[in-house]
Amino acid sequence: MLKAIILAGGRGKRLKPITDYVPKPLVPIKNVPIIEWQIKYLEKYGIKEVIICTGYKTEMIENHLNMKNIGIKVKFSIEKTPLGTGGAIKKAGKMINEKSFFVINGDIITNIDLNKLAEKKNVIASIELRTKYGILETNEDKILNFREKKEISDTWMNAGIYHLQKEVLKELPDKGDIEKTLFPEYAKKGKLNTMKFKNSKW
């Protein structure tokens, strides 16, 4: 059974001032911390072990999960200095023996189907780009169509969930973001795939 890496080492600057006191994985959504939502989600798809990449307020996350009855095995990959998403995956990947694994960003709550995602190698889950603003279709200064707060058709965004082959680990930087290093290189070589999830919660 595959393992999953949760990228939870960031400081959560966009959630300040909350994250001045609580690490982003422990920020509650409907009174349940994000990290618990994620573990339940991964457990639903048969994941038996997660590796949580931490750096900021690691002890708070460890202590919280130790007090909970978590149904799957939890390990920690601790960054003494920020490594970026690529460096974090590479470091955590040393604990993975399987041929492939999942990666999920530490601030996501979703229902994207991991079984479907696992059908492809080196694949990024993508969802339709969403906006809270009305969309105008124009011809010079005339509005042809007005669409209120919805998905932008045929424009897809990275959902922050990946199914990767173990071989990618040796190509990742020791420090740096996977989105700025490996993914662009793989895309140019035709080695990076996506699976589109329409109408998924995210």
Protein language model features and the residues they cover:
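Active-site glycine-centered loops adjacent to acidic/histidine catalytic or metal-binding residues
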Residues: 10, 107, 128
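Short beta-strand-to-loop element that shapes/binds the nucleotide-sugar donor at the catalytic cleft/hinge
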Residues: 56, 123-140
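Catalytic-core segments of class I nucleotidyltransferases/pyrophosphorylases
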Residues: 101-102, 109, 115-118, 130, ...
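Conserved beta-strand scaffold positions in the cores of enzyme catalytic domains, especially
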Residues: 26, 76, 122-123, 192-194
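Short, well-ordered beta-strand micro-motif
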Residues: 28, 137, 163-165
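Conserved catalytic-core motifs of eukaryotic protein kinase domains, centered on the activation segment
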Residues: 17-20
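Conserved N-terminal catalytic core of the sugar/cofactor nucleotidyltransferase
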Residues: 3-6, 14, 28, 32-105, ...
